[in-house]
Amino acid sequence: MGQIPLEHGLIVATILFALGFYGVMVRRNLLFMLMSLEIMMNAAALAFVLAGSVWAQPDGQVMFILILTLAAAEACIGLAIVLQFYHRFHHLDVDAASEMRG
């Protein structure tokens, strides 16, 4: 089976990143914004893995592991913030975040 051309993979990564960015900018629900950030991080990880595969370097896989670790930490902290936000306001509308004090 042949290798995926770099251009095709970067196009897919760009589309994924754009979808994630669109989700962060348009959606007002905190949970959907968190999921959109995860999509953006996965798009960057895909670009690193693809570049490492094309140039036969393990650096792309190392960066993928780093991004995977950062995404897991971001998900944990983000979900904790989402839970606290929901317990306080009983909704996940991010426009209400300006009312937060503490």
Swiss-Prot record:
GO terms for cellular component: NADH dehydrogenase complex; plasma membrane. Pfam families: Oxidored_q2. It is a multi-pass membrane protein. GO terms for biological process: ATP synthesis coupled electron transport. It comes from the Bacteria. It catalyses: a quinone + NADH + 5 H(+)(in) = a quinol + NAD(+) + 4 H(+)(out). One of its GO terms (molecular function) is quinone binding. It is an enzyme of class 7 (translocase). Keywords: Cell inner membrane, Cell membrane, Membrane, NAD, Quinone, Translocase, Transmembrane, Transmembrane helix, Transport, Ubiquinone. Gene3D superfamilies: 1.10.287.3510. It is found in: Cell inner membrane. The chain crosses the membrane at residues 6-26, 30-50, 62-82. NDH-1 is composed of 14 different subunits. Subunits NuoA, H, J, K, L, M, N constitute the membrane sector of the complex. Belongs to the complex I subunit 4L family. This is NADH-quinone oxidoreductase subunit K.
